[in-house]
């Protein structure tokens, strides 16, 4: 069955909340069930299989994490992976696949200390990268495609008003369901790491309280964006850059090697270790003595000396 062959191919790159259950190695019928009918529908209509991926928002404002506000080699490798994935699917199914990146940076810039100007610059950089790698299977979708004639603040308020759930209902799920609790913790720690650096005059306790509240707001808007995107692309398969439960209706996906389950190009810097690119925090990369590479007047990635690279490869093999 072509649809199952395609799905199992995609599942090779699944990003899961846990990799200890049998489903991590051999997806069961419940793992496949949310996605197979959608793939089969595209096949029956001889159409490209369409995926949506909320991702590529903007770079973290934390200089200890990233190289700056513009896309770098991390984004380039991730976008090339997505294009390659579509190319691989076309070898299984003649009509191939398409991916729409639903850029959510504008959705919560005010919550994560990113300016709208930097969101715009980042998005322009992403489009340049797509052109450079000839990514003909990828297009983009953003808040401006939906709400026209509004300021960015008005767009965000309209999104929340029309699509958001009450914060209280999100808190209830976080308190009662482990998968929601893990997601909350992931968002909280991303915010906390940034706020510690960005607001050095605030106490740790103040930042903990603020990030706790902000994390719920980020999840609220993220869910609202998910609902909006789902209404615009009701038949599409949903990819996610966040780790997912085995039986989720979203497919968490690894686009580039990371040092943890939550790593993304916009919260890390890319480093070439002599074998492959991987994502790590910028400060950690610099602490181990990697050298910075520039491209087109922008910082691109780091490279390790052979000696340090071999040491890291040895450590990776032991872990």
Swiss-Prot record:
UniProt enzyme class: lyase
Pfam families, alphabetized: DIT1_PvcA
Catalytic reaction list: D-ribulose 5-phosphate + L-tryptophan = (2S)-3-(1H-indol-3-yl)-2-isocyanopropanoate + hydroxyacetone + formaldehyde + phosphate + H2O + H(+)
RNA-binding found in the keyword field: no
Top-rank lineage group of the source organism: Bacteria
One GO MF term attached to the UniProt entry: lyase activity
Keywords: Lyase
Keyword Lyase attached: yes
EC number(s) stated in the UniProt entry for this protein: 4.1.99.25
Biological role: Involved in the biosynthesis of ambiguines, a family of hapalindole-type alkaloids. Responsible for the synthesis of the isonitrile group on tryptophan using ribulose 5-phosphate as the source of the carbon atom.
Entry's family note: Belongs to the isocyanide synthase family.
Protein name per UniProt: L-tryptophan isonitrile synthase AmbI1
Organism (species): Fischerella ambigua (strain UTEX 1903)
